[in-house]
Amino acid sequence: MASPNRHWPSMFRSNLACNIQQQQQPDMNGNGSSSSSFLLSPPTAATTGNGKPSLLSSGCEEGTRNPEPKPRWNPRPEQIRILEGIFNSGMVNPPRDEIRRIRLQLQEYGQVGDANVFYWFQNRKSRTKNKLRAAGHHHHHGRAAALPRASAPPSTNIVLPSAAAAAPLTPPRRHLLAATSSSSSSSDRSSGSSKSVKPAAAALLTSAAIDLFSPAPAPTTQLPACQLYYHSHPTPLARDDQLITSPESSSLLLQWPASQYMPATELGGVLGSSSHTQTPAAITTHPSTISPSVLLGLCNEALGQHQQETMDDMMITCSNPSKVFDHHSMDDMSCTDAVSAVNRDDEKARLGLLHYGIGVTAAANPAPHHHHHHHHLASPVHDAVSAADASTAAMILPFTTTAAATPSNVVATSSALADQLQGLLDAGLLQGGAAPPPPSATVVAVSRDDETMCTKTTSYSFPATMHLNVKMFGEAAVLVRYSGEPVLVDDSGVTVEPLQQGATYYVLVSEEAVH
């Protein structure tokens, strides 16, 4: 090991020489020892033979000219605060240049020397190390006392080997950082370099994070006592009353077993099922408070998109009429009249004059009333409007009416309408107890006047589950699909298959039936 006083300032050498000379002066004067006179020059000889002052005499004179502080130095509170701040910042073993700067900073509050600063840092490190050792010893005894009661199972006893029992336990995490800094400072004492402990602290935090997220191994007899204690005590779970933040969420959290976490998929399923199961209760709360007129408006509003699609189909058909009416050679069909007719029917539907209950009532009349020439087959519509007051509630509210008060065909379609309720409710078309609109099909009646070469069209909306009587448009009327394929009818003129939902049909009517 190098000399411990190699970095000491020069004042210690001068003071040591003066002390030795003062102790040897009585022997020189009293006994006249030759050895004393040989080692030390007499006090009267201030210079050597060549006229230069001796080392010891010059040191004493320097000590008398520049008085140094006493060996026992009592720092002031201001100086202690400065030193503590420097020590806590990470400089636990300052070099010689830093000691001089610190001494100049401390001299503003009182006389201090370089040696005082050096020894203060050494004593401060020793006190820190002693505190850490005492704290680790205290926690070691506390864990050893709690180990047999906490980690051992009730039926078996864990016997630790001598090597594991003699192994030093890991100190608490709050003291681990300070212990690392003290050990690094003690290793740097001989070299005199100042190394910061921040890299060591960063490495410690990284290793601690890895230790926290690593899986816990199975407890065996080869593990230290502290690891057995930690692994046998999992993290306590929060109670149910701490997790529940609102009365609405209590039914969701209490029906699941307590666990450390719940996957996001399961949580989403719980919330989705809860909102789905609560929807029918809200819908069936007030089923009889909605009037038929309000439900009629909801039906028309929900089918606005379907009516727009019907208009698009009419536009396509008008642009290529020979594709549908190739059997009757209606090439002079006017697209403007077709679009205007659809627009008028759309306005009637929004005003409540044309809805899904009209077609069923009109189908019961085998002989419709025909108006004068140039009227566009409006008789089924007018007959249906006259009977709309009696059949609106039966078609819109199938669950609140009786079979005796409704026609037979209305009762037949009520069961089919009931099957569509749940699907429309789940689709979000209805809100708060409104009844869903029944499925419908669009029928467009097309007639052509051979004299004026003008084509007239009229659009109707019928329930999709009914069998349409084509003869209501005339004895020679023909029903075709939008692709031009004719629809099969029986001898009485009723379609063999019911109308398809959302489909568009065309009725080819001769002008004689209109007159």
Curated annotation (Swiss-Prot):
GO molecular function, one term: DNA binding
Compositionally biased spans, kind Basic residues: 130-143
InterPro entries found in the cross-reference section: HD (IPR001356), Homeodomain-like_sf (IPR009057), WOX8/9-like (IPR044557)
Cross-referenced Pfam families: Homeodomain
Chain intervals with Polar residues compositional bias: 23-32, 44-57
Entry keyword annotation includes Amino-acid biosynthesis: no
CDD domains: homeodomain
UniProt subcellular location: Nucleus
Compositional bias (Basic and acidic residues): 62-71
Main location: nucleus
Biological-process GO terms, alphabetical: regulation of developmental process
One GO cellular component, as annotated: nucleus
The entry's DNA-binding region: 68-132
Region (Disordered) location: 23-76, 130-156, 176-195
UniProt keyword Nucleus present: yes
Keywords: Developmental protein, DNA-binding, Homeobox, Nucleus, Transcription, Transcription regulation
Biased composition (Low complexity): 144-156, 177-195
Role noted for this protein: Transcription factor which may be involved in developmental processes.
Sequence similarity: Belongs to the WUS homeobox family.
Protein name, entry field: WUSCHEL-related homeobox 12
Native organism taxonomy: Eukaryota, Viridiplantae, Streptophyta, Embryophyta, Tracheophyta
Gene name tied to this protein: WOX12
